[in-house]
């Protein structure tokens, strides 16, 4: 009887997946599972690096085979929204073996903040280590609470490192210039400050700032023109897709398309034109996380589109970008919270579910 029940459950699950696939413009292939996966990136040979929020990093083959957890990853402060976050490669990884990790770290007492470290990924045969690990950036100041770290990273074509720094649920720091909370920062690859940053003359942590007035930016991506875009969690609704421009102020917490969680209104962007407005705002929320701007050939009709991971929306949201304008085009129900979307070397899509036992999914054209 138990075997019959298992068979029926598996058959029902299979039919559900097939029915789901039939309604989607891609085929879904589960590849592996992880405990609270957060981010991934591709190595030059097609393997992936995948982070788990609790502090583990894996080297993963495209068939789902995993290494043992990479050793000597920095200790993380795992609580709330904190833990191990993003992972990206140095632009010259093939020669210097450097990878970058973002994570939440504890401070003295009950304060904590995001940090970025880099180290050389070395090893083979399923066993890997990080060597010469150094912390190159920290949120300043560290504060109490355990949310809104942001800590997404992206390199531009010139080798500058951009990091999103959330407001840490403190509101006002996003508008204050004596810290880097609620900002997007721009650094050299070693963590030093570029000489042409917009506020470099002010020195100290202010010199890092590229843009301000952000709440919790959980995605960063460059388009083919070299422009930086970000996805940002709003308060009660009001999630955003922003075109991030040097020295611009995006207005939070003074303006937002959402409201405070207690229901108190926040003025909309159109009431304060001095602040940069989002290119897309979502009411109700989609809870955007990681995203890409697609440049591959497997889905040529989507070239130049943003593909956004939706947490609360349990979807992939496709946004068409036309010059400086953008609009949601379609929403693909994935049946689970989606944390990350990445483009593989062949142009297929790779997706991480946000859960204990969250799956790594490969999305391919329906006729592949």
Predicted segments with their positions:
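Sec-dependent signal peptide recognition
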Residues: 1-8
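N-terminal signal peptide c-region/cleavage motif recognized by signal peptidases
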Residues: 14-16
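Surface-exposed loop and turn segments in beta-propeller and other repeat-based domains
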Residues: 68-82, 131-149, 189-210, 252-283
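Beta-propeller blade signature
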Residues: 114-125, 177-190, 244-245
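Repeat-solenoid scaffold signature
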Residues: 205-240, 245
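Conserved blade-ending motifs and adjacent loop-strand segments that build the rim/top face
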Residues: 214, 325-345
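Short acidic/glycine-rich loop or secondary-structure boundary segments that cap or lie
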Residues: 229, 236-242, 249-253, 259-264, ...
């Amino acid at each position: 009887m138990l075997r019959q029940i298992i068979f029926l459950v598996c058959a029902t699950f299979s039919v559900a997946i097939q029915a789901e696939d039939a309604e989607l413009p891609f085929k879904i292939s589960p590849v592996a599972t992880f405990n609270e996966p957060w981010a991934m990136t591709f190595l030059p040979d097609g393997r992936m690096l995948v982070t788990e929020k609790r502090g583990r990093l894996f080297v993963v083959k495209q068939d789902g085979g995993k290494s043992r957890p990479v050793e000597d990853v920095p200790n993380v402060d795992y609580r709330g929204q904190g833990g191990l976050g993003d992972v990206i490669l140095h632009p010259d990884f093939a020669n210097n073996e450097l990878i970058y990790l973002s994570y939440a770290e504890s401070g003295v007492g009950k304060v904590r903040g995001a940090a970025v470290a880099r180290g050389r990924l070395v090893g083979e045969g399923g066993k890997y280590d990080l060597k010469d690990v150094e912390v190159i950036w920290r949120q300043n100041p560290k504060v109490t609470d355990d949310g809104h770290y942001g800590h997404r990273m992206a390199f531009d074509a010139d080798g500058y490192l951009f990091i999103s720094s959330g407001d840490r649920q403190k509101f006002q720091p996003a508008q204050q210039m004596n810290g880097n909370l609620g900002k997007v920062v721009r650094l050299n690859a070693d963590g030093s400050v570029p000489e042409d940053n917009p506020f470099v003359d002010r020195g100290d942590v202010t010199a890092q700032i590229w843009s301000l007035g952000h709440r919790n930016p959980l995605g960063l991506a460059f388009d083919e023109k070299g422009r930086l875009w970000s996805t940002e969690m709003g308060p009660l609704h009001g999630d955003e897709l922003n075109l991030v421009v040097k020295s611009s102020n995006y207005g939070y917490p003074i303006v937002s398309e959402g409201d405070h969680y207690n229901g108190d209104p926040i003025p909309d962007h159109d009431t304060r034109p001095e602040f940069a407005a989002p290119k897309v705002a979502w009411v109700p929320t989609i809870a955007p996380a990681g995203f890409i701007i697609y440049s591959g050939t497997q889905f040529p009709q989507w070239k130049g589109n943003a593909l956004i991971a939706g947490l609360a929306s349990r979807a992939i949201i496709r946004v068409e970008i036309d010059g400086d304008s953008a609009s949601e085009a379609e929403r693909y129900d994935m049946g689970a919270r989606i944390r990350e979307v990445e483009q593989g070397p062949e142009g297929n899509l790779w997706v991480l579910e946000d859960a204990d036992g969250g799956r790594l999914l490969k999305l391919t054209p329906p006729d592949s």
